[in-house]
Amino acid sequence: MQHPPCEPGNCLSLKEKKITEGSGGVCWGGETDASNPAPALTACCAAEREANVEQGLAGRLLLCNYERRVVRRCKIAGRGRAPLGTRPLDVSSFKLKEEGRPPCLKINK
């Protein structure tokens, strides 16, 4: 059984073509394979999903920068806005008078 090459869009077409049969095999466009269908293609799809997640995160970060006019790496979630990787201790110890306002930090007064 030959599987399609690892290219963008193949995982979606793969999901559309996959039909489970009553015998326990999986039908791939007319072929039946009772074993695990395509480990290499499954790994390819996992890599494609990870790339889509990273691309989505990058898109959100740029959106945050564009719409909110804040520094890159700003996370929009929850109540406050702080750069990714900022610990609460780092934020609370920031000196506002000497160093200015920290980027992406929403201060509730």
UniProtKB/Swiss-Prot annotation:
GO terms for biological process: negative regulation of apoptotic process; negative regulation of kinase activity; positive regulation of cell migration; protein stabilization; regulation of protein stability. Keywords: Cytoplasm, Nucleus. The keyword Lyase does not apply. GO terms for cellular component: cytoplasm; nucleus. Its main location: cytoplasm. The keyword Cytoplasm applies. Expressed in the neuronal cells of the cerebrum and cerebellum, spermatocytes of the testis, pancreatic cells and also the heart. Expressed in both primary and metastatic neuroblastomas and in thyroid tumors (at protein level). Expression is associated with poor prognosis in neuroblastoma. Expressed in the fetal brain, lung, liver and kidney at varying low levels. It is found in: Cytoplasm; Nucleus. Interacts with MYCN and GSK3B. Regulates stability of MYCN in neuroblastoma cells by inhibiting GSK3B-mediated MYCN phosphorylation. Inhibits GSK3B activity by promoting its phosphorylation at 'Ser-9'. This is N-cym protein.
